[in-house]
């Protein structure tokens, strides 16, 4: 059972062995770790080089740096102490084993430092989600987007929207409370409606970009499709830079979906090799064809490969057409085709450039504000309530005010002011110990 009154500790840097290991302690007794192991606590935010010793015996554990960050001016909002050690496994184990013996100290649970930062008002829910995304970011676009989120880009936008919404609500409530007293202007709902309409426009713009944010966060899917023996697996291997797929002149060799992860245009991409699309009586191959169609339909971009100009299915949305085996056929291709030879590499750079261009159109530009389905749903709820408030006829200010209050509550859900515990539990399960 975890208690917020405990002082928690953990290795907060990367996996050992490493050049330097950082052990962090946070909680009401964090100072005592410095006194017990180093015999001192340095001034706030000042590093001191000290000998760390086992309390009682005086045995030397290591020599390193000690820093102290008193709450609330710390990452967690609590007193926090850091020990910067040599990154050997035995050194780290010895220090952790010593800390666990101190009264009131216990090992931190996964994500517990961040949970305390949230509880102490250092981070809101959107920022915690951004930090979770930053920890697992693989591509440059994911890093930039997660960093913007964890730095409060969405939180600041929501705070501004909420402030304006509360101002509009106050105007409507003033109309309700004081309209008969002559202390307020006759038409306060007009400015309130204007503000609500402006908010609707801004939320609509943010939501229109949500799909891009979620795509960048999750990574893009590019499916390689085409008839059997069109060179799909050969192209996959060429783009992956390794022999990821079996290549055979026998049509129907690829029967299942094969995935390779790579980066293009700063984006995380899953490249999917699919079974050749054709009619077949082979039950296993037929299942592969079915799966290929499903993956192609759910992908962000389809590369349609053919060595003879076979057209893609009419229900396939705007594929990038690629004429393969140029080294064998010598074909020049149609105007909308890119001609390549995956064997010799001819045309591959042109193909990659076009793939990167299309990925840039789908996921480029400044980081999106909305990056998760939960955020999108909450903002959609706020937009719905604002639209409902604007639809209210005059002289029904009570109902209009209620819709504005519900819109404010929906905005609160974005940053975790309400209904937050279940989301936090799910989030912190994805965090590492020490974060």
Curated annotation (Swiss-Prot):
Pfam families xrefs: MMR_HSR1, MnmE_helical, TrmE_N
Residues that, per the record, bind (6S)-5-formyl-5,6,7,8-tetrahydrofolate: 24, 82, 122, 435
GO CC annotations on file: cytoplasm
InterPro entries, alphabetized: G_TrmE, GTP-bd, GTP-bd_TrmE_N, GTPase_MnmE, MnmE_dom2, MnmE_helical, P-loop_NTPase, Small_GTP-bd
GO MF annotation terms: GTP binding; GTPase activity; metal ion binding
Limits of the TrmE-type G domain: 219-360
Any one biological process term the GO annotation gives: tRNA methylation
Subcellular localization: Cytoplasm
Intrachain disulfide bonds: none
First-tier enzyme category under EC: hydrolase
Cofactor annotation comment: Binds 1 potassium ion per subunit.
EC number: 3.6.-.-
PROSITE patterns, per database record: G_TRME
Residues binding GTP, per UniProt: 229-234, 248-254, 273-276
Recorded family membership: Belongs to the TRAFAC class TrmE-Era-EngA-EngB-Septin-like GTPase superfamily. TrmE GTPase family.
Functional summary from the UniProt entry: Exhibits a very high intrinsic GTPase hydrolysis rate. Involved in the addition of a carboxymethylaminomethyl (cmnm) group at the wobble position (U34) of certain tRNAs, forming tRNA-cmnm(5)s(2)U34.
PANTHER family: TRNA MODIFICATION GTPASE GTPBP3 (PTHR42714), TRNA MODIFICATION GTPASE GTPBP3, MITOCHONDRIAL (PTHR42714:SF2)
Assembly information from the UniProt record: Homodimer. Heterotetramer of two MnmE and two MnmG subunits.
Protein name per Swiss-Prot or TrEMBL: tRNA modification GTPase MnmE
Organism annotation: Azorhizobium caulinodans (strain ATCC 43989 / DSM 5975 / JCM 20966 / LMG 6465 / NBRC 14845 / NCIMB 13405 / ORS 571)
């Amino acid at each position: 059972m975890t208690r917020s009154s405990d002082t928690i500790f953990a290795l907060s840097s990367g996996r050992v062995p490493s050049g330097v290991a950082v052990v962090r302690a946070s909680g009401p007794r964090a100072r005592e770790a410095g006194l017990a192991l180093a015999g001192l606590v340095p001034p706030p935010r000042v590093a001191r080089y000290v000998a760390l010793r086992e309390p009682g015996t005086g045995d030397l554990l290591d020599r390193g740096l000690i820093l102290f960050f008193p709450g609330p001016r710390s990452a967690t909002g609590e007193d926090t102490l850091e020990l910067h050690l040599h990154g050997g496994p035995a050194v780290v184990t010895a220090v952790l084993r010593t800390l666990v013996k101190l009264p009131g100290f216990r090992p931190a649970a996964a994500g517990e430092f961040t949970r305390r930062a949230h509880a102490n008002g250092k981070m809101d829910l959107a920022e915690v989600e951004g930090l979770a995304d930053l920890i697992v970011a693989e591509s440059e676009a994911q890093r930039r987007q997660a960093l913007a989120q964890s730095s409060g880009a969405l939180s600041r936008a929501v705070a501004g929207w909420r402030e304006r919404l509360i101002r509009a609500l106050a105007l409507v409530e003033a109309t309700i409370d004081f309209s008969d007293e002559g202390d307020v202007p006759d038409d306060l709902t007009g400015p309130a409606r204007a503000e609500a309409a402006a908010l609707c426009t801004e939320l609509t713009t943010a939501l229109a970009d949500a799909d891009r944010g979620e795509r960048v966060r999750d990574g893009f899917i590019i499916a390689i499709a085409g008839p059997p023996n069109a060179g799909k697996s050969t192209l996959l291997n060429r783009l992956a830079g390794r022999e990821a797929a079996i290549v055979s002149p026998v049509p129907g060799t690829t029967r299942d979906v094969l995935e390779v992860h790579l980066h293009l245009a700063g984006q995380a991409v899953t490249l999917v090799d699919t079974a050749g699309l054709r009619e077949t009586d082979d039950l296993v191959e037929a299942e592969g064809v079915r799966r290929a169609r499903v993956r192609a339909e759910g992908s962000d971009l389809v590369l349609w490969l053919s060595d003879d100009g076979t057209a893609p299915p009419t229900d396939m949305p705007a594929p990038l057409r690629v004429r393969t085996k140029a080294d064998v056929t010598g074909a020049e291709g149609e105007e909308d085709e890119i001609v390549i030879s995956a064997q010799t590499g001819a045309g591959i750079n042109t193909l990659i450039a076009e793939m990167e261009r299309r990925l840039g159109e789908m996921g480029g530009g400044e980081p999106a504000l909305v990056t998760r389905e939960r955020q999108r749903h909450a903002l959609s709820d706020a937009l719905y309530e604002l639209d409902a408030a604007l639809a209210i006829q005059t002289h029904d200010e009570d109902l209009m005010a209620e819709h504005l209050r519900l819109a404010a509550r929906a905005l609160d859900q974005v940053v975790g002011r309400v209904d937050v515990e279940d989301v936090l539990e799910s989030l912190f399960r994805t965090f590492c110990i020490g974060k």
